[in-house]
Amino acid sequence: MSTIRDVAKLANVSVATVSRVLNHSLSVSENTRLVVEQAIAQLAYQPNANAQALAVQNTDTIGVVVTDVTDAFFAILVKAVDKVAEAHQKTILIGIGYHHAEKEREAINTLLRKRCSSLVVHSKALSDDELSHYLNTVQGMVIINRVIKGYEHRCVSLDNQKGTYLATEMLIRYGHQHIAYIGSNHAIFDEVERRNGYLAALKDHNYPIIEQAITLNSPDFEGGEKAMIDLLSYNKNLTAVVAYNDSMAAGAISVLNENNISVPSQFSIIGFDDMPIARYLIPKLTTIRYPIDLMATYAAKLALSLTDEKIITPPVVQFNPTLVRRFSVESR
């Protein structure tokens, strides 16, 4: 594992200069700061930054790392953590990862340097090994929406596979014979689990798996539009789709409307997450509820309990998805 001396050697500066960069000293020139930060990133240097932060903890602050604050899913997550923080007379600091390992690492390290004693981290790009290292180093860190082996008691997760299984099975029971799946093109565990749930339901009901009925794109409105266009181009018999999330479902519905394909009388669709948009689409979207508000509340309480013995540790649970029936599904 890299040390501060390794960073100094690679950057061709003194150990004291590296220390000043880590402490955001104004006495360091911008060029020197950039060279040192590049060396830190290249060596994946973390331990001393963590140790420095942990040596003088600030128990009044909870750090939150999310992927994108413009996404309603993460806005709900942050709001839930903030409510817990407020109830315990604390404040929150937010770091953003943008689906990039370097950004996630930088966000976590920055929050640690800001002396956050508790962290709620939503990480999709960092490896299990690196997150294990953080969990081993940072007593008050909790992972949300992911499970790290050996630290299951500090991870808050959802059974994603069960969610898409429920969605696909509903369409099967409504008589649909040709069901597609619109997934995320991000290489994350959520996508693997949700696709596996769709495939498992087809297999359990003896439905054939058609490769052309599975398409991946960016997990947003535009990605849903592009994915639906691809599906309509390759498959003329499709009557239903399970979408990775509500945003992709909304994009898909837009394409169906543009092609004069009525939802749900001609085509059924089920989303995932139950974000506010699901209630305002036309028709209102049948979806799988992801209880991120409850999960984030639990994660924040767990993170606080790990650093404050006066706060009772909540019981460990894996949250379950539920089917929310609205008006985007109809029998065949």
From Swiss-Prot:
One of its GO terms (biological process) is galactose metabolic process. Pathway: Carbohydrate metabolism; galactose metabolism [regulation]. The keyword NAD does not apply. Keywords: Carbohydrate metabolism, DNA-binding, Galactose metabolism, Repressor, Transcription, Transcription regulation. The keyword Cell division does not apply. InterPro entries: HTH_LacI, LacI/GalR-like_sensor, Lambda_DNA-bd_dom_sf, Peripla_BP_I. Coiled coil: none annotated. GO terms for molecular function: DNA-binding transcription factor activity; transcription cis-regulatory region binding. Residues 4-23 bind DNA. Residues 1-56 form the HTH lacI-type domain. PANTHER family: HTH-TYPE TRANSCRIPTIONAL REGULATOR GALS, LACI-RELATED TRANSCRIPTIONAL REPRESSOR. Repressor of the galactose operon. Binds galactose as an inducer. This is HTH-type transcriptional regulator GalR.
